[in-house]
Amino acid sequence: IWDDGRKLFKENIRMKGLIAKKVGMTQVFDESGNLIPVTVIRIDPNTVIATRTKERNGYDAVVLGIDDAKESRVTKAYKNQFAENIAPKRTLKEFRDFEKEVNVGDQIGMELFDGIRFLDVTSTSKGKGFQGVMKRWGFHGGRASHGSKFHREAGGTGQSTTPGHTFKNIKMPGRMGSKKVTIQNLQVVKTDADLKVIMVRGAVPGNKDCTLIVKSAVKK
């Protein structure tokens, strides 16, 4: 019953999504005079590269692309997936169960999100390099007083005589960041069709000018 219900739910839900770029953060005032930190997201027109259908591929999806690439810089195999009238794109993304009916070559802009108040944004977080447990996991650390030799270390990880070894998945120093992160339910504060930007409340993962995947919020 659970599998059937979950499958039925997935078949009924339709998504809206586009490829975008992160411009940076700023702040705006609302009607009450409150200061709101916002992230500016630029959504240039996305080109429909290909479509997937249940009859041909077993599922419904749309492949979108942005940023033209030099034809001399792409391989023949990569170029062959584009129609003759479409220039090769640097960034491609497949969106399953796309809500809007589209054809290859169509241009989809930020008007797709008209009337939507909350968005989910996915990107790769900033890489922090190899970090200790205090920065990576928020450990308290040791005393900073005189005579202490335990300041920013993780402490004992092997426990006592039993079990006498370190378990898997223990929080330890390591490489931090540079992971795929999704921030859900970001409120749309302001839109500007002329500048092709959407301002959402709060922060978005990634550095400036990074590629974002913007979708309509699943949980709203």
Predicted features by range, described:
Residues 9-220:
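Extended basic (Lys/Arg/His-rich) segments that typically form rRNA-contacting surfaces
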